[in-house]
Amino acid sequence: MAVRIRLKRIGKVKRPFYRIVVADSRTKRDGKVIEQVGKYHPVQNPSFIEIDSPRAQYWLSVGAKPTQQALALLKLTGDWARFCGEENPVSRVEQPVSIEAGKSAPKSRRRSAPVAAGEATPTVSDRSDLPSVSDTPQDVPEDVRGQA
């Protein structure tokens, strides 16, 4: 069985992202896979590339051939150089920022302004400047006022 390391496309129209997978060369692009060894998100800036290096090395060692696109990603991460026997392969991919560090406060916390310790929160009874519900506007005709 001829095994290939290739990209499986997932995502929306015009918003693709890929999984780097090991699959039989005769299967469809998005068909059944043997194993997923990584992810690639080209739309992000900078592009997100994550490859499980030990698993990629294993599949390369047993004869899996990468496609051109997968080979380019393996070269960027340094896995291809490691497979070819270089002593100190260098990854040109930036390490991803942790998700927790990039998150900000939830929307509910961002919307509410912090209240000072001595300051009271305004209530409905404190708002005497607003018209009450019982006030009838003067521009409403007489026949409509009586119906309400």
From Swiss-Prot:
Which residues, if any, are the signal sequence?
none
Q: Known SUPFAM superfamilies for this protein?
A: Ribosomal protein S16 (SSF54565)
Assigned GO CC terms:
cytoplasm; small ribosomal subunit
User: Where do the segments described as Disordered lie?
Assistant: 89-148
The biological process GO terms on file are: translation
User: Cell membrane among the record's keywords?
Assistant: no
Asked if the record carries the keyword Transport, the reply is no
Q: Cite a single GO MF annotation.
A: structural constituent of ribosome
Q: What InterPro entries does the record tag this protein with?
A: Ribosomal_bS16, Ribosomal_bS16_CS, Ribosomal_bS16_dom_sf
Q: Which domain of life is it from?
A: Bacteria
Could you tell me the keywords of this UniProt record? Answer: Ribonucleoprotein, Ribosomal protein
Q: Which NCBIfam families match?
A: PRK14520.1, S16
What's this protein's family per the entry? Belongs to the bacterial ribosomal protein bS16 family.
Spell out the protein name for this chain. Small ribosomal subunit protein bS16
**UniProt organism field:** Tropheryma whipplei (strain Twist)
Upper lineage is: Bacteria, Bacillati, Actinomycetota, Actinomycetes, Micrococcales
